[in-house]
């Protein structure tokens, strides 16, 4: 453990409760103070202030707390298995979780309250605004969503939604797919089966509005 130093270097483990700009460890770094970079073979954890985390398996940044000042989530988290942070602009891993905002997430599983770009097998959250590309997309927002299945059951979606199956409670814009469904639609559906439950025509092949 160290209360403050310019560098922590260890073959196994580093722990700090003070300001340590750089932590390098073979296995794990843990810090509760100010940290610029954490680099570890297995994992990193920062409780309050960190800018960059790189690990072989996983990274954990500060938990988002509305009433707590002085928190600095990492600008970037890079790992093979999983990244978690309250608010991280860039995350690349098999699974990524950013509780609040994220600019870019790349992984098999991506979760964010408000994301701009999500690329993965499963993406969830609100696109605000941006692009979501995956096998399954869930959430709200827009303007571009592309997947096998776009399933949006909370909030309004808008823009262009393309997939084999598009489902939205409320959609403003274009739905392009084999099966399109919307409770409320301000736009057009193009596909084999188009359902606009509250529209003039509930079900139409080809095009519905």
Report the location of each language-model feature.
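Surface-exposed, glycine- and small/polar-enriched segments that build interaction surfaces at terminal
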Residues: 1-209
């Amino acid at each position: 453990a160290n209360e403050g130093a310019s560098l922590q270097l260890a073959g196994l483990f580093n722990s700090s409760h003070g300001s340590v700009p750089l932590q390098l460890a073979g296995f794990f770094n843990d810090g509760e103070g100010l940290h610029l970079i954490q680099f570890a073979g297995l994992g990193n954890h920062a409780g309050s202030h960190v800018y960059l985390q790189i690990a072989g398996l996983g990274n954990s940044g500060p938990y988002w707390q509305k009433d707590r000042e002085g928190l600095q989530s990492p600008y970037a988290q890079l790992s093979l298995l999983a990244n978690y942070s309250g608010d991280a602009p860039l995350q690349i891993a098999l699974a990524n979780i950013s509780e609040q905002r994220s600019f870019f997430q790349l992984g098999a599983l991506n979760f964010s309250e408000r994301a701009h770009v999500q690329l993965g097998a499963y993406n969830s959250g609100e696109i605000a605004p941006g692009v979501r590309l995956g096998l399954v997309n869930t959430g709200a927002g827009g303007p571009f969503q592309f997947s096998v299945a776009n399933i949006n059951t909370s909030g309004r979606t808008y823009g262009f939604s393309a997939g084999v199956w598009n489902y939205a409670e409320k959609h403003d814009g274009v739905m392009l797919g084999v099966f399109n469904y919307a409770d409320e639609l301000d736009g057009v559906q193009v596909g084999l089966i188009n359902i606009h439950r509250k529209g003039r025509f509930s079900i139409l092949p080809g095009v519905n509005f």
